[in-house]
Amino acid sequence: MFCGLNDVNVCTISLQMAMWRPNESKVYLPPTPVSKVLSTDVYVTRTNVYYHGGSSRLLTVGHPYYSIKKSGNNKVSVPKVSGYQYRVFHVKLPDPNKFGLPDANLYDPDTQRLLWACVGVEVGRGQPLGVGISGHPYYNKQDDTENSHNPDAADDGREYISMDYKQTQLFILGCKPPIGEHWSKGTTCSGSSAVGDCPPLQFTNTTIEDGDMVETGFGALDFAALQSNKSDVPLDICTNICKYPDYLKMAADPYGDSMFFSLRREQMFTRHFFNRGGSMGDALPDELYVKSSTVQTPGSYVYTSTPSGSMVSSEQQLFNKPYWLRRAQGHNNGMCWGNRIFLTVVDTTRSTNVSLCATVTTETNYKASNYKEYLRHMEEYDLQFIFQLCKITLTPEIMAYIHNMDARLLEDWNFGVPPPPSASLQDTYRYLQSQAITCQKPTPPKTPTDPYATMTFWDVDLSESFSMDLDQFPLGRKFLLQRGATPTVSRKRAAATAAAPTAKRKKVRR
């Protein structure tokens, strides 16, 4: 529509026909719903009752490189105890439902159950600071590549080499054992490999047990399967698996049982630079160098280094100090399911290996063959905990949730799920060993009550070491101090003795 030219106000109105187009945007369906994991704070009620639990002085002594076996029966006479091993303590707690509680009305045993929550921990470490040395009498070191050196064509260029490892301090607390990761030998496809080919690598998750070797600076590998010459790494790991905690998997655990919280401090630098002796498995590409007329083949270009953890200091210690658990990284906020917790410790700052000497023959003059030298390593621990008493009301919804999480918990609380009723009549023979009847089926093996019975841990039983007198223990006093509570000492006032009444004198008038 148009307005006249003589009009004062001129306006133009244009109309556009609507045009339909198909919807070109993608339609996204909602994701598949997943079961929601509840935090323990939702269905667990904390009380104001606290207990202290502590171990005795824990000591271990052994050889730092390998186990020593007797020649006769092949029995281990001296175990392997190294400062570069994991110490996984399996701490067993008393059942609070069988505990003598100060208040009988604290919970209802018909509908509720008691459990422990760890709220404080302190790992005490004895022994002085020191650096442990490891090595190999036949270490695969061909040349010192840090300095100029002509390639050595010897068939056996192994030498005596020793070194100190990467410095590690590690601390993991949970109600399940920690999960470790390492690279192992994978499986090759049929017909795709030949003798001498590089083995395929496979990422592997395993449970970290007590005595497993930590990652020392040579990688988290299965050295027994991936290094057949047994000389690429020192003696204490050349036939072992070095594991590294899988922090990613433990942090992604829906329940968070393997790691309530963790502390770690790692430190390393490279000290020496070597190359490996042997034939080169991967050919060096021609475009990476100009060929020489004097040297037909280049030297070994498989370079390696020796690690070093550098200086140890008391100012950088993670141990001998308390830690308080307010909020765990996962949904399990410190609940000790199954009345157990696992404490994983690594401390390479106290890895000193001591030398012991014994005399073979007595002579006046010194002769090296007259003495036998031995090597030992010692460790000392002291574990202290603060536990809070908690209660859980077992409603049908909570029981179903716990059954999906861990069915053994309800069985331990005498809330087992009854089996379905059987409509058929069962046959039971009297004499099972009699040859007059048909052969009976073997009895199925009983499932072990302890799911960790086949694993190796350092068992610490605290069943008889709980106490409510927190002010009588160092960690308990620290706990009371950070809560702002002071220990009270009740003193009874001495009973006042009744004084004998004084007889009044009669006034006598004179």
From Swiss-Prot:
UniProt region (Disordered), positions on chain: 490-510
Pfam families for this protein: Late_protein_L1 (PF00500)
One Gene Ontology term, aspect cellular component: T=7 icosahedral viral capsid
Sample GO molecular function, one term: structural molecule activity
Domain of life: Viruses
Keywords assigned: Capsid protein, Disulfide bond, Host nucleus, Host-virus interaction, Late protein, T=7 icosahedral capsid protein, Viral attachment to host cell, Viral penetration into host cytoplasm, Virion, Virus endocytosis by host, Virus entry into host cell
Keyword Mitochondrion: no
One GO biological process term: virion attachment to host cell
Subcellular location, record wording: Virion; Host nucleus
Quaternary assembly: Self-assembles into homopentamers. The capsid has an icosahedral symmetry and consists of 72 capsomers, with each capsomer being a pentamer of L1. Interacts with the minor capsid protein L2; this interaction is necessary for viral genome encapsidation. Interacts with protein E2; this interaction enhances E2-dependent replication and transcription activation.
Functional description taken from the UniProt entry: Forms an icosahedral capsid with a T=7 symmetry and a 50 nm diameter. The capsid is composed of 72 pentamers linked to each other by disulfide bonds and associated with L2 proteins. Binds to heparan sulfate proteoglycans on cell surface of basal layer keratinocytes to provide initial virion attachment. This binding mediates a conformational change in the virus capsid that facilitates efficient infection. The virion enters the host cell via endocytosis. During virus trafficking, L1 protein dissociates from the viral DNA and the genomic DNA is released to the host nucleus.
Family: Belongs to the papillomaviridae L1 protein family.
Record's protein name: Major capsid protein L1
Organism of provenance: Human papillomavirus 57
